[in-house]
Amino acid sequence: IYLDVDIIVLDDLSELYRLNIDDKYIAGIRAAGYYYPEKHAQNTMNILDIDSMEYYVNAGVLLINLQNMRRDNLEEAFNQLICKKYPSMDQDILNKVCYGKIRILHPRYNAMTKYKLLDDNSYKNNKALQIAYSIREWDSARKHPVIIHYADKIKPWEDVEMEYAYEWWRAAALLPFFSDIYRQYIKNGQMKKINVQLNEENRRI
């Protein structure tokens, strides 16, 4: 299992790890933002020279079949493309090289804050989500996420009031170097917001 650094795991990953990808290279969730508008989707297909966006996945959370990758020498294919300037860098390269051998995961394994997880109208107001997921999938993902992915320009260590910032700070408070993080926020004038967040945490424990 590969996880980006800007994620929080909220539940057991054993079910994800046990998923069958014997005939695949990777498994991930559909990268909804690349599915719409159609012009953007077509442009990605042209750049990567692929026939469909149906299996284009976000690279932030991946289940990887290393055995198949080594068997088919995918490292060489990656090395050949790594010097090219793809718009989404590693994500584009992974989708290009692994095309045809990608399994789609349920979006609860990579619930991205940029899609407004706490907004009841997020699905209705986002055409990309409607193309990538069913309403049932999306509701399940945002209400019962296994992994929260802060896949946006704003991160919880920059804005303690963003969606699911509470979960990130709760995890950060357990780290041995949390005092360093806290001191940095004091320097940035964020101490009041952090105190409010931590006091809220104390009330919930």
Please state what every model-predicted region is.
Residues 22-29, 34-41, 52-54, 78-91, ...:
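Glycine- and acidic-residue-rich phosphate-binding/metal-coordinating active-site segment common to enzymes
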Residues 45-52, 133-136:
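Short, P/G- and charge-enriched loop/turn segments at secondary-structure junctions
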Residues 59, 64-205:
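A glycosyltransferase accessory/donor-loop signature
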Residues 49-61:
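A recurrent flexible, glycine/aromatic-enriched loop bordering the glycosyltransferase active site
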Residues 24-48, 162-170, 178-181, 197:
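A short, conserved beta-to-alpha structural element at the edge of catalytic cores
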